[in-house]
Amino acid sequence: MYVVSTKQMLNNAQRGGYAVPAFNIHNLETMQVVVETAANLHAPVIIAGTPGTFTYAGTENLLALVSAMAKQYHHPLAIHLDHHTKFDDIAQKVRSGVRSVMIDASHLPFAQNISRVKEVVDFCHRFDVSVEAELGQLGGQEDDVQVNEADVFYTNPAQAREFAEATGIDSLAVAIGTAHGMYASAPALDFSRLENIRQWVNLPLVLHGASGLSTKDIQQTIKLGICKINVATELKNAFSQALKNYLTEHPEATDPRDYLQSAKSAMRDVVSKVIADCGCEGRA
């Protein structure tokens, strides 16, 4: 089977001391870049999409593309629901064939977060679907959701254990100082908090908001228990800037098969770097 859940991927990463990158895609071209690069580097990767991406491209279309590309390259792939919030939406996509879910109820009070997440876990585990949830809240913008700095809060290590045990999740997304989007200056990550969380929780840990982080910071988080690294904005920026540059230099260009090549190449460089930073080359 080529379309897999993330559970085994992340458990392997936890045992092996590396991380699996989750790349947010938006269309055929961005998916091609991720899958082709991962296959060439024999690296495990997760194809992630926000609710907006699934609405834009279509759930059935994305599933068909992932399945076809996984078979074409003989490369197992996971397609993952990133930052999904609605149970009915998640259930519909799981029944369509998605096998990895992030239920994001991090904006809710602790007890309500547990209740919402457990409902999703109980449903998804019936279908052998892995579930990620977040404790703490990152700043920045993801899809149409904007979290202001005043609403940001970090993961409490002791609460993290209670949360994991009460919900039955397969992986835990933590808030240690990253944010969605690109950084104006290097963020100060709370490594001691991450180390403490690792001591309280034995699940694979997930880092959101990794676009623009230094190689050193990414690799330090992996040493302290991060097994999944999420990258979105950095991919979009590379793709769109290269496309703008090409069309500025070639205003006569009309064939997308030509003018999208530079955008794909720029994005491929980012994907290759993230795979190297995660230490997962040759691990598929």
Swiss-Prot record:
InterPro entries tied to this protein: Aldolase_TIM, Class_II_FBP_aldolase, FBA_II, TagBP_ald_KbaY/GatY, TagBP_aldolase_GatY
Full protein name: D-tagatose-1,6-bisphosphate aldolase subunit GatY
Tree of life domain: Bacteria
Phylogenetic placement of the source organism: Bacteria, Pseudomonadati, Pseudomonadota, Gammaproteobacteria, Enterobacterales
Binding-site list for dihydroxyacetone phosphate: G181, G209, A210, S211, N230, V231, A232, T233
Pathway the protein contributes to: Carbohydrate metabolism; D-tagatose 6-phosphate degradation; D-glyceraldehyde 3-phosphate and glycerone phosphate from D-tagatose 6-phosphate: step 2/2
Entry keyword set: Galactitol metabolism, Lyase, Metal-binding, Zinc
Catalyzed reactions per annotation: D-tagatofuranose 1,6-bisphosphate = D-glyceraldehyde 3-phosphate + dihydroxyacetone phosphate
Organism: Shigella sonnei (strain Ss046)
Residues of the active site: D82 (proton donor)
Cofactor annotation remark: Binds 1 zinc ion per subunit.
Function description: Catalytic subunit of the tagatose-1,6-bisphosphate aldolase GatYZ, which catalyzes the reversible aldol condensation of dihydroxyacetone phosphate (DHAP or glycerone-phosphate) with glyceraldehyde 3-phosphate (G3P) to produce tagatose 1,6-bisphosphate (TBP). Requires GatZ subunit for full activity and stability. Is involved in the catabolism of galactitol.
An example Gene Ontology molecular-function term: tagatose-bisphosphate aldolase activity
